[in-house]
Every structure is written in structure tokens, then in C-alpha cells.
């Protein structure tokens, strides 16, 4: 079960909170967790991306895992910050339904909060395979499939 707080700081249309909960729970690998998902605009995403990653411009999803001090019980996984305009643009560019891309970004971010990464090729393969399996369980296509123009 997930205790999800959804913060909407973007004027873009986004899926409802039930969808975010479904996607986050599908990716959850422990019995209970607390997660904050903040939906932001390009400006906030770009500022956070610059501050925490040293990168210019907005990005689709940022993950901020909560590091629990040793010996302290805590269900807080951390925060996800998702840029609505970037998700919408990427879905259009990749020729996929926007809701499927939202689901992918939530699943991707949730896996980061739980220690998955994609810096090394072997880690990326493990993470991507996990994402594909979770999304398949939600009835969605492989987000990494080749998109071929018709």
C-alpha cells in the first residue's frame, strides 16, 4: 500500500490521483511506503534540474530518495518531480498515448526511489526490464519499443 501525496504546481492537464496511485503501487517493492509526487511546469523542473543535476533545461522526472538514518524505522521513500509539459511533448514525439508515458514516468521514478539506476549498461537493462514488466502488468506496451513512422 502506498501513502501518496500528489501536488499539482502545473496548469497542464494531468491524470487523476487514482491513476498516479495505481502506477506508483504497481512499482512498489515493499509492503508500505510514503511518496510525494509533485507535478511542475518547465521553469520549476529546469531550476531543480540545474540545482541537483547541474543540467540545463527541464527534464521529464526527477527522483529525490529519502535517506533514512540507520536504525530509524520509516516508510518515506522520497519525492518525484514530474514536468507535465515535458511528458506531454515526449509522448507526442514518441508516438505513444500520453497516459502511457505518464505511467512510465511514475514507474521509472518509483524504481529510482527504490535504488534502481541506469548509469551503467547492466543496471539500465535490469531497470528497463523491470519497467517493461510493471507496465505490461498495467496493460501497457513496452515504452522502449522502436517507434517507426508510418
Swiss-Prot record:
It comes from the Bacteria. The keyword rRNA processing applies. Its main location: cytoplasm. Zn(2+) binds at residues 108, 112, 118. Binds 1 zinc ion. It is an enzyme of class 3 (hydrolase). Single strand-specific metallo-endoribonuclease involved in late-stage 70S ribosome quality control and in maturation of the 3' terminus of the 16S rRNA. This is Endoribonuclease YbeY. The lineage of its organism: Bacteria, Pseudomonadati, Pseudomonadota, Gammaproteobacteria, Methylococcales.
Amino acid at each position: 500500500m502506498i501513502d501518496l501525496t500528489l501536488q499539482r504546481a502545473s496548469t497542464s492537464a494531468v491524470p487523476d490521483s487514482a491513476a498516479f496511485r495505481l502506477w506508483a503501487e504497481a512499482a512498489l517493492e515493499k509492503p508500505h511506503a510514503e511518496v510525494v509526487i509533485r507535478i511542475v511546469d518547465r521553469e520549476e523542473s529546469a531550476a531543480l534540474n540545474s540545482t541537483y543535476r547541474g543540467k540545463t533545461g527541464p527534464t521529464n522526472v526527477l527522483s529525490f530518495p529519502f535517506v533514512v538514518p540507520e536504525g530509524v524505522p520509516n516508510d518515506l521513500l522520497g519525492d518525484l518531480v514530474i514536468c507535465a509539459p515535458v511528458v506531454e511533448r515526449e509522448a507526442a514525439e514518441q508516438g505513444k498515448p500520453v497516459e502511457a508515458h505518464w505511467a512510465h514516468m511514475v514507474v521509472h521514478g518509483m524504481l529510482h526511489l527504490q535504488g534502481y539506476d541506469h548509469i551503467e549498461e547492466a543496471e539500465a537493462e535490469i531497470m528497463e526490464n523491470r519497467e517493461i514488466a510493471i507496465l505490461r502488468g498495467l496493460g501497457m506496451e513496452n515504452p522502449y519499443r522502436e517507434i517507426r513512422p508510418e
